[in-house]
């Protein structure tokens, strides 16, 4: 696969993930729904999570901060999977988004997944 194709796939996935995180963050900032508030604990926690999702999106999109954005998005979604699992809620959607984030990271930053040793 050539570099141009990798970039197109990487940025397309970045746009999709950015859209998902932005929509979710804005939904949480607007108040969400009662079930979500009960699962998270309080309205304050929900607003904090919404702001966190928007910050992750802002870090994910630019090339210079994209690596940190990918790492933060991976960790955030892993936490979301754990919360859904403990609350006995379906985890298929969050696992799907987590897989998209990993694939996005692979196409945008293949060095994150290489087995080459970095010289000290």
Indicate residue ranges for each PLM-predicted region:
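Membrane-interface extramembranous regions
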Residues: 2-120
């Amino acid at each position: 696969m050539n570099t141009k194709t990798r970039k197109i796939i990487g940025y397309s996935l970045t746009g999709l993930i950015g859209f998902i995180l932005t929509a979710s963050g804005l939904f949480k900032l607007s108040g969400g729904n009662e079930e979500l508030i009960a699962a998270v604990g309080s309205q304050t926690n929900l607003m904090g999570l919404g702001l966190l999702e928007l910050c992750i999106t802002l870090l994910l999109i630019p090339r210079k901060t994209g690596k940190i954005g990918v790492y933060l998005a991976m960790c955030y979604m892993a936490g979301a999977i754990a919360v859904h699992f403990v609350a006995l809620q379906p985890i298929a959607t969050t696992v799907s988004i987590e897989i998209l984030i990993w694939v996005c990271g692979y196409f945008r930053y293949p060095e994150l997944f290489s087995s080459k040793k970095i010289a000290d």
